[in-house]
Amino acid sequence: MKKLSFQQIILTLQNYWQDYGCAILQPYDAHVGAGTFHPATVLRCLGTKPWSVAYVQPSRRPGDSRYGMHPNRMQHYYQFQVILKPSPDNIQDLYLKSLECLGLDLKTHDIRFVEDDWESPTLGAAGLGWEVWCNGMEVSQFTYMQQIGGIECRPVAGEITYGLERLALYIQGVDEVKELDWNGQVGEKALKYGKVDFEAERQFSKYNLELADSEMLVRHFKDSEEQCEWLVKKNVPFAAYDECLKASHAFNQLNALGVISVTERASYVLRVRHLAKICCTKWLEMNE
C-alpha cells in the first residue's frame, strides 16, 4: 500500500467517518487550542439530541512555540476531531479500523490505550479517557465526554482526537514533521510540510515568545470577558462563545510570555471557565 500524504490522511479520515454517518464539518474560524474548543463539540455535546460529526481543526498553543526547531512539537498544528453522541459501544473498534484505513499495520505497531482521564480547566470539561500511544508516542486522545461548562453531558458523547502530524510520522516513516509529504506529488509539484507551515511557525514563535505586547493582551482579555458576559445576557450564546475563545487565547499568549504568576494564572483559568459555563448554560437553556 502506498504511503498516504498528509492531505490524503485527512481525506481518508473524512471518508471513513462520513461512511459511518458523521456530518463532515469545517474548521472553526477562531484561535483555539484544540479541536475540542470548536462549538460543534463544546455546545453540541450538551443536551439530549444525537450529534455525530467530524472535522479538521487547526490549533494554536503559544506555549509550544519552538521556532520550528522541534521534530514534533509546534505552536500551530492540526487535529482531526470526531464526536459521536450518544457514544456507540464499539467506538474503540471504530477507531482501530480507521487506523488500518490509514495504512497502519496494527500487528507491527505497538498500539496502546493508556488510561488518562481528560480535563480542560478553562472549559470546565472532563471525562473518562485514554491516550492512544503508537510505539510509545501519543497520537490520539479518546474520551467519554461527561461534563462541559460544568454541566453534565446526558447522554455521554464519545470524542476521538487524532494528532494528525504524529500519526503521519508513523504512516510515512519519517522522523520530523517538516519532512512529511504534504500532497503526494513528485518533482516541482511536491510539497513537504515544512514548506507549507514552517516559516509561519518560526515567525509566530518569535511573536509568541518575544514580541507580543502583554499590556495589550491584558486589555484584550478584559474586553472579550466583558463582551462575552454582555452577549450572553442578549441571548446570543454562539457570539458570546466567540468572545470566550478570544479571552482564552489571550490568556494562553500571556502564559507563553511568562508574565503571569501562578496565582494570576489560576485566576485567569477561573475567569475563562466562568465564560464557558455561562455560554453553555445559555445555549442549553435556549435549545432544550
UniProtKB/Swiss-Prot annotation:
GO molecular function: ATP binding; glycine-tRNA ligase activity
Subcellular location: Cytoplasm
PROSITE patterns reported in the protein's UniProt record: AA_TRNA_LIGASE_II_GLYAB
Pfam family, one: tRNA-synt_2e
Listed SUPFAM superfamilies: Class II aaRS and biotin synthetases (SSF55681)
Keywords, comma-separated and alphabetical: Aminoacyl-tRNA synthetase, ATP-binding, Cytoplasm, Ligase, Nucleotide-binding, Protein biosynthesis
EC top class named in words: ligase
Catalytic activity: tRNA(Gly) + glycine + ATP = glycyl-tRNA(Gly) + AMP + diphosphate
One cellular component (GO) term of this entry: cytosol
Record's protein name: Glycine--tRNA ligase alpha subunit
Lineage: Bacteria, Pseudomonadati, Pseudomonadota, Alphaproteobacteria, Rickettsiales
